[in-house]
């Protein structure tokens, strides 16, 4: 089974590691490196750092929906694309690329807290629990059928502690 993995933050890294153990990760797609700190040095995304450690090819398009990016993804001829906190909305053209489907791992109990920063929003909104949802990607923001959910009690955990769960 040939995979494309799309992710950016630390939350995505354990899933990339596990996917790499299970199959052929042909391409890792992450957001562009950003300037950070006082020196404004370019800092690699956590997913890029891990992908390089694993010897995987990394692709960092500014716009995942550009012709060049879509052509690159098409070249891979992936069976499945796995998306974990990638950070850009995918067009139908990308959704239709893999042989089988695209799955998204989202850090909330969908349909609640769609979109960015769901862990932080769960805490700020005073939710008792949150979780992780596995869903098939369809057109729309975190839309598509949810196939699996894991609930986590928030308690007195902060966002970093919840991400680690």
Where are these regions (language model features)?
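Residues that cap or flank secondary-structure elements
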Residues: 7, 38-39, 61, 111
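Donor/substrate-binding cores of folate-linked one-carbon enzymes
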Residues: 80-165
């Amino acid at each position: 089974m040939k995979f494309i993995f799309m992710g950016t933050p630390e939350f995505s890294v354990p899933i990339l590691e596990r996917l790499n153990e299970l199959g052929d990760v042909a391409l890792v797609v992450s957001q562009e490196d950003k300037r950070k700190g006082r020196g404004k040095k370019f800092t690699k995304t956590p997913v890029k750092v891990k992908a390089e450690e694993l010897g995987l090819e990394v692709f960092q398009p500014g716009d995942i929906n550009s012709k060049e990016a879509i052509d690159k993804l098409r070249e891979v001829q992936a069976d499945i694309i796995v998306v974990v906190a990638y950070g850009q909305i995918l067009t139908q053209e990308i959704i239709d690329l893999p042989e089988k489907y695209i799955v998204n791992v989202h850090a909330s109990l969908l349909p609640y807290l769609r979109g960015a920063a769901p862990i932080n929003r769960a805490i700020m909104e005073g939710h008792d629990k949150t979780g992780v949802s596995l869903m098939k990607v369809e057109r729309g923001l975190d839309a598509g059928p949810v196939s699996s959910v894991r609930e986590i009690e928030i308690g007195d955990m902060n966002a970093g502690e919840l991400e680690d769960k």
